[in-house]
Each structure stands twice: as structure tokens, then as C-alpha cells.
Amino acid sequence: MAMAAAASLLPACAAPTLPGRAFRPRRNSTPTASLSCDGGSRGRGVGLGVILGGGRAQGVRRNAAAETYVPGSGKYIAPDYLVKKVTAKELEELVRGERKVPLIVDFYATWCGPCVLMAQDIEMLAVEYENNALFVKVDTDDEYELARDMQVRGLPTLYFFSPDQSKDALRTEGLIPIDMIRNIIDNEL
């Protein structure tokens, strides 16, 4: 009875995803207000995973009907979005190649709650800056070596590359407001 009462106090996004299954909070977790996922912990007891009651943020897949399951991988692939997922080789070509617009790279993981939240903002910015910036994303689970080489320690991590290759890239880590991303694109690059 106490478990049902505790589950009713959780936000709607923390409700059980399977019918008939009771919500069971993790015993060894300590609630945290962090909005980033530590890259080395794979979501165990960090950030929204703890707040939402488990190692993985529950309810991450917003529209399961629109996604395709990849057998054997345990992953769902979303339909095409404006922000293209790139490989290490493709990213290297984009960074080293000549661009007339800034390049924004989102390092994310499918199990990272803050990454899912930021992905929505990144998609909106891709529409807003359609001809004035290029947005791409890198799945750190698929491109582990690249993430390590780029020193991605927490998720989400954004890199901002100026079209002027003499300027250093800017980096942010964790969930940041959409206005801060706009400010970096408009004023820093």
C-alpha cells in the first residue's frame, strides 16, 4: 500500500511503462538534481535515471510506433530527423572540411535522460538555423573511441566549431538552456 502511495507522488514521466508492474525505487540510489549523465556510469544512479527511479530514464521513447527495432542491438531507431547521426569518419570530414556555417556536434546516448531532453531543443534549433548552422549528433555507444578521443566525460556534450578554423572549438557539458546555445551560435562563433 505504501508503495502505491509513493508511486502516485512521482511525476507522470516516472510512471511504470509496463501495465501491471509496480514502481520499485532503487535501494542504493540517492536522489540528485544533476541533469547530466556521467559517461562512465552508463546511467547507473546518475542524473534523471535516479530521479525517475532506475538506471535508465523510463519513458524515454516518446513515440514507439514511429520507431524501428534493430534486432540483437536492443535499440530503437527513430525516423529521420533534421539532425543527422554521423560516424567518426564523417565528423572528421565535417570538422576538417571547409564550411561557411558553424558546426554543432551533440554527443549523446540513447539511455541518457538529459540527452533526450536536449535532443528536442537541438531539433528546434536545426529548424531555426536551417541555413546558418549545421547540427549533427554522435551516439557515444556506437562511437566510443571518438567520444574518448574528444574527452566526452558527461552527457550530453556539445561541441561548437566555428567556420573560421583558426578559432578554437567551444564545449559544453550537461543540459543547457536553448537560449545559451543560441547565444553561443550568434555571438561566439
Swiss-Prot record:
Keywords: Chloroplast, Disulfide bond, Electron transport, Oxidoreductase, Plastid, Redox-active center, Transit peptide, Transport. The record marks G113, P114 as: Contributes to redox potential value. The record marks D106 as: Deprotonates C-terminal active site Cys. The active site is at C112 (nucleophile), C115 (nucleophile). CDD domains: TRX_family. It is found in: Plastid, Chloroplast. GO terms for biological process: cell redox homeostasis; plastid organization. InterPro entries: CITRX (IPR044182), Thioredoxin-like_sf (IPR036249), Thioredoxin_CS (IPR017937), Thioredoxin_domain (IPR013766). Its main location: plastid. Its EC number is 1.8.-.-. Pfam families: Thioredoxin. Belongs to the thioredoxin family. Plant CITRX-type subfamily. Probable thiol-disulfide oxidoreductase that may play a role in proper chloroplast development. This is Thioredoxin-like protein CITRX, chloroplastic.
